[in-house]
Amino acid sequence: MPKMKTNKGAAKRFKKTASGYKFKQAGLRHILTKRRTKVKRHLRAKCMIAASDIKSVKKLLRHG
């Protein structure tokens, strides 16, 4: 049986914390002139994974 491998794309996107997994929101790369400052400020904040997605993220991050 081969070793279980971590999904490297997911490993770069999610970080394990004591209270769950955090990630950076999308939508802050380009075409930002039409967005309000408040929206851009809120997109800068890190978010936590929803409870319904934790099982799938754990499966992707086998060793993390």
Swiss-Prot record:
PROSITE patterns: RIBOSOMAL_L35. Gene3D superfamilies: 4.10.410.60. One of its GO terms (biological process) is translation. InterPro entries: Ribosomal_bL35, Ribosomal_bL35-like, Ribosomal_bL35_CS, Ribosomal_bL35_sf. GO terms for molecular function: structural constituent of ribosome. GO terms for cellular component: cytosolic large ribosomal subunit. The keyword Magnesium does not apply. The keyword Methyltransferase does not apply. Keywords: Ribonucleoprotein, Ribosomal protein. Pfam families: Ribosomal_L35p. HAMAP family: Ribosomal_bL35 (MF_00514). Belongs to the bacterial ribosomal protein bL35 family. This is Large ribosomal subunit protein bL35. The gene is rpmI.
